[in-house]
C-alpha cells in the first residue's frame, strides 16, 4: 500500500537551506504531520513508513491515480487557496485487475523507454538504501557500547570508587552478597578440614607401610640411616686413626640394644651432641675413615640394653655435646611408637598458626572481591543508564535513517519465499517464547541480577520467566495476524502448517 503526496506550490521548499521549511504537509489518512518535508519539488511516495521520491519516467509516476485535494482543518491557517496540498491516495478499481495494467505498462516501458537509465537509477537508489541501513545499524549498536565503555572506565568508576571507599563503611552492597561471602568461606573451611584429614591419613599410612626399621643406627628426618657401631650386640674393633686423643668409656651389654627409629622428634632444633659416631663423615664396617678431630668428651655408660639404661641414654644424649656434629632432628621411639607429647603439641601449635594465617588470607581475599563487586554493580547501573539515554537520543535524531533501515529490512524480508519467511519467524518465536526458552530466560535474569547487584530470588526469576514470554507470545501473534496476514497470507498459511 502506497500513499503519495504532491506539492502544487514548490516555493515552500528552500533548496539552499533544506533544514528550513515553511509548509508542513500531511501524509496518510490520519493526517500525521511530518517534522520537515523532504527538500524536493518532485512527487514522493510513502512505503512502510518511509518517504521516497518518485523518479521521472518510472512506473509509479506514470500510473493513473486519483487526486483528492484536502486541507487540514487543524492547520488551515498555514495555507491559502493557492497553497493546497494534493494527496494521491489509491488507484480506482476498474473492470480489470490493477496487476494487468501494471504488467502492460512495464512491458511498454521496456520497449519504448530508456531502460538503461531507469535500471541505473534503481540500482543507485537501492545502493543508497543499503549503505544507509548499514550505517544506521552500526551507529545504533556501537555508539551506546562505546559510551558505556568510556563512561564506565573513565567517569563513573573512579567517582564510585572514591565515594564507596572513603565515605561508605560497608563492604557488601546488600545482605545477599554477604551471605554469598559467608557460604564461600564455609566451603573453604570444609576444604581445609578435608585436606588436613587426608594429610594425616597419608602420614599414618606412610609409617605403617614403611620398611622394617634397621637396628644399630640413627634415622634422620629425610630418611637417611646412619649406622652406629656402638649399638651392636657385640663390640667392633675401632680403628686407632678414627679419633685423636679421645678417652671413650662405653659399656655395652649383650641384651638387645637401644634402637633409634624414625617417628619421634626428640630435638626441636639443631643441637651439638657429644656423640662422635654421629659425625657425617664417619665410616664404618671396616671401611676407611677419614681423620676427624673432636674436642674432649667424656662418655660413661651412654647406652644400655635395659629400660633404665635407655632412659639414661636419652638424658645423656641431650646433655652431652659434640664439636662439629650437626644433627638434624634425631628421632627416638616412644613407648607406643608415636611422638612425644611435648613435640606433638609444638607441631600442632605451628599447624594451627599456619591454618589461621590461611583463613586470614582467604577472608581478606573475599572482602576485597566483594568490595570490588559492589563498586562494579553501582558502576554498571549508571553506565548503562547513560547508554540508554544515548540510545534514545539516537532514535530521535536518526528518525529518517531508521525509517529507511526499516523499509529496507522489510523489503528484504518480503523478498524471501514463503517457506523461508515461515522458518525465520518460527526460529525467532521458538527462541524467545518456545518450550525450551525458559532456561534461556533464567540465565538472562540471573545475569541481570548479578550485573546490577540485585538480590537474587528464585521466586522472582520464576515469576518473570512465567509472565514475560507469555506477553511476547501474545505480541508475536498480534503482529502475525494484524500485519503479516495482510501483506503475505501465504506466509501465514505456511507458518501455521509448519506449527501443526
Swiss-Prot record:
Its main location: plastid. One of its GO terms (molecular function) is proton transmembrane transporter activity. It catalyses: K(+)(in) + H(+)(out) = K(+)(out) + H(+)(in). Keywords: Antiport, Chloroplast, Hydrogen ion transport, Ion transport, Membrane, Plastid, Plastid inner membrane, Potassium, Potassium transport, Transmembrane, Transmembrane helix, Transport. Residues 204-354 are annotated as: Insert. Belongs to the CemA family. It is found in: Plastid, Chloroplast inner membrane. Pfam families: CemA (PF03040). One of its GO terms (biological process) is potassium ion transport. This is Potassium/proton antiporter CemA. GO terms for cellular component: chloroplast inner membrane. It is a multi-pass membrane protein. HAMAP family: CemA_PxcA (MF_01308). The chain crosses the membrane at residues 129-149, 378-398, 425-445, 461-481. Contributes to K(+)/H(+) antiport activity by supporting proton efflux to control proton extrusion and homeostasis in chloroplasts in a light-dependent manner to modulate photosynthesis. Prevents excessive induction of non-photochemical quenching (NPQ) under continuous-light conditions. Indirectly promotes efficient inorganic carbon uptake into chloroplasts.
Amino acid at each position: 500500500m502506497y500513499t503519495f503526496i504532491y506539492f502544487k506550490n514548490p516555493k515552500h521548499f528552500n533548496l539552499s537551506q533544506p533544514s528550513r521549511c515553511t509548509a508542513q504537509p500531511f501524509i496518510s489518512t490520519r493526517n500525521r504531520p511530518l517534522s520537515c518535508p523532504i527538500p524536493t519539488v518532485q512527487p514522493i511516495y510513502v512505503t512502510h513508513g518511509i518517504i521516497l521520491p518518485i523518479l521521472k519516467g518510472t512506473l509509479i509516476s506514470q500510473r493513473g491515480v486519483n487526486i483528492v485535494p484536502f486541507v487540514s482543518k487543524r492547520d488551515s491557517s498555514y495555507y491559502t487557496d493557492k497553497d493546497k496540498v494534493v494527496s494521491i491516495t489509491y488507484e480506482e478499481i476498474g473492470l480489470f485487475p490493477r496487476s494487468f495494467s501494471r504488467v502492460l505498462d512495464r512491458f511498454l516501458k521496456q520497449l519504448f523507454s530508456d531502460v538503461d537509465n531507469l535500471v541505473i537509477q534503481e540500482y543507485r537508489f537501492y545502493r543508497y538504501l543499503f549503505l544507509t541501513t548499514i550505517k544506521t545499524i552500526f551507529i545504533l549498536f556501537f555508539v551506546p557500547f562505546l559510551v558505556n565503555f568510556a563512561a564506565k572506565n573513565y567517569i563513573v568508576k573512579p567517582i564510585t570508587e572514591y565515594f564507596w571507599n572513603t565515605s561508605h563503611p560497608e563492604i557488601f552492597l546488600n545482605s545477599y552478597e554477604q551471605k554469598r561471602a559467608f557460604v564461600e568461606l564455609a566451603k573453604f573451611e570444609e576444604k581445609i578440614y578435608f585436606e588436613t584429614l587426608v594429610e594425616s591419613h597419608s602420614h599414618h599410612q606412610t609409617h605403617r607401610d614403611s620398611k622394617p626399621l634397621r637396628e644399630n643406627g640413627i634415622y634422620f628426618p629425610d630418611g637417611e640411616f646412619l649406622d652406629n657401631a656402638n649399638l651392636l650386640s657385640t663390640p667392633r674393633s675401632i680403628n686407632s686413626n678414627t679419633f685423636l686423643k679421645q678417652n671413650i668409656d662405653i659399656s655395652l651389654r649383650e641384651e638387645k640394644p637401644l634402637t633409634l627409629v624414625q617417628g619421634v622428634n626428640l630435638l626441636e632444633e639443631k643441637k651439638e651432641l657429644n656423640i662422635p659416631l654421629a659425625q657425617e663423615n664417619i665410616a664404618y664396617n671396616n671401611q676407611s675413615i677419614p681423620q676427624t678431630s673432636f674436642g674432649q668428651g667424656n662418655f660413661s655408660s651412654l647406652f644400655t640394653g635395659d629400660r633404665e639404661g635407655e632412659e639414661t641414654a636419652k638424658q645423656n644424649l641431650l646433655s652431652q655435646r659434640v664439636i662439629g656434629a650437626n644433627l638434624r632432628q634425631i628421632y627416638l621411639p616412644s613407648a607406643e611408637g608415636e611422638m612425644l607429647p611435648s613435640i606433638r603439641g609444638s607441631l600442632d601449635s605451628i599447624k594451627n598458626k599456619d591454618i589461621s594465617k590461611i583463613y586470614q588470607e582467604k577472608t581478606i581475599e573475599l572482602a576485597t572481591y566483594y568490595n570490588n563487586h559492589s563498586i562494579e554493580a553501582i558502576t554498571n547501573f549508571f553506565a548503562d543508564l547513560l547508554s540508554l539515554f544515548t540510545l534514545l537520543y539516537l532514535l530521535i535524531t536518526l528518525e529518517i535513517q531508521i525509517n529507511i533501515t526499516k523499509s529496507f529490512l522489510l523489503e528484504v524480508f518480503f523478498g524471501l519465499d514463503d517457506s523461508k519467511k515461515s522458518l525465520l519467524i518460527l526460529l525467532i518465536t521458538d527462541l524467545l517464547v518456545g518450550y525450551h526458552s525458559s532456561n534461556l530466560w533464567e540465565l538472562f535474569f540471573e545475569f541481570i541480577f548479578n550485573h546490577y547487584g540485585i538480590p537474587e530470588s528464585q521466586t522472582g526469576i520464576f515469576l518473570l520467566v512465567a509472565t514475560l514470554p507469555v506477553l511476547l507470545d501474545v505480541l508475536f501473534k498480534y503482529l502475525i495476524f494484524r500485519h503479516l496476514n495482510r501483506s503475505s497470507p501465504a506466509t501465514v498459511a505456511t507458518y501455521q502448517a509448519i506449527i501443526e
